Amino acid sequence: MGTMVHIVEGTHHTYKNFFTKEECDHIISIFERDKDIVPYGTDTGYEGLTSTYSEYNWLYNKDIQPLNIPQRLFDLDYFSDWEYMVVQCWGNALHVGEELKEHYHGEIMEEHFRRMYFINCNIFLGGEYNKTWYKDIGYTHNEPGDLHLFSCELDHRVDHNIGHNTRYSMALDIYPDSNRMLMLPDKHMSRYSIHKRPII
């Protein structure tokens, strides 16, 4: 299903204004509205909104779907030769003093996706503290709507939030192989979503 996609180690691209400021504010409002009703993971090693990644995909949220995020990803030049993408999408809300320790996304527990190269995206949504550290480029300052796209072996982190408000971002893991999605146990279907490039 689909054509073979080769993901190069060390891939890292930045796209400005993937979301508008208004869209970022909208997503933040949905995160805040629904944070107490979405399922949370209990053994992810993370707390708060980040821990929902193992149980819930925000692309299924009826108030985020109108943003048509999968189509907008297909429209990025990096994905120009992708026919399918399997997407996991979650939110991060770092309150004052909280952090995301250095990590990379290639070390995953799901057997169906293990040993498979894939793409990560971080989209900064808002907050006074806007720095992210990536192993290849060091610290970068983000504006609301900025998207960083990078291969899954790249270490990255967010240091302690020293701003005066909560820092919000959206994260996505994006896989090119839809066949593996079809083999997933039903219990994971709420975690991943499959998308096909629209025929124009």
Tell where the protein language model's regions lie, with residue ranges:
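Catalytic core of non-heme Fe(II) oxygenases with the double-stranded beta-helix
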Residues: 81-188
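Non-heme Fe(II)/2-oxoglutarate
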Residues: 1-83, 191-200
